[in-house]
Amino acid sequence: MIIPVRCFTCGKVIGNKWDQYLDLLQLDYTEGDALDALQLVRYCCRRMLMTHVDLIEKLLNYNTLEKSDNS
């Protein structure tokens, strides 16, 4: 969904690093090098960025208020 604001394990703020992480990946950094550049050294924080799946854009396509006509 949306990147969590804090790491689930240690509580470090990581939500502000998501866009920078994606930018570094676009510049052909490896995942490890991008996380090193963002100064994320704890494996729990690294996990939060590496395993996040951004689904918010896909979910915005669905309108929960629409009723389907199943007659």
UniProtKB/Swiss-Prot annotation:
Principal location: nucleus
GO biological process per UniProt: DNA-templated transcription
Any one Gene Ontology molecular-function term assigned to this protein's record: zinc ion binding
Keyword set includes Lyase: no
Transcription in keyword set: yes
Subcellular location: Nucleus
Cellular-component GO terms for this entry: RNA polymerase II, core complex; RNA polymerase IV complex; RNA polymerase V complex
Listed SUPFAM superfamilies: RNA polymerase subunit RPB10
One Pfam family matching this protein: RNA_pol_N
InterPro entries: RNA_pol_su_RPB10 (IPR023580), RNA_pol_suN_Zn-BS (IPR020789), RPABC5/Rpb10 (IPR000268)
N-terminal signal peptide: none
Domain of life where this protein originates: Eukaryota
Positions annotated to bind Zn(2+): C7, C10, C44, C45
Keywords for this protein: DNA-directed RNA polymerase, Metal-binding, Nucleus, Transcription, Zinc
Subunit structure: Component of the RNA polymerase II, IV and V complexes. Interacts with NRPD1.
Similarity comment text for this entry: Belongs to the archaeal Rpo10/eukaryotic RPB10 RNA polymerase subunit family.
Function of the molecule: DNA-dependent RNA polymerase catalyzes the transcription of DNA into RNA using the four ribonucleoside triphosphates as substrates. Component of RNA polymerase II which synthesizes mRNA precursors and many functional non-coding RNAs. Pol II is the central component of the basal RNA polymerase II transcription machinery. It is composed of mobile elements that move relative to each other.
Name by which UniProt lists this protein: DNA-directed RNA polymerases II, IV and V subunit 10
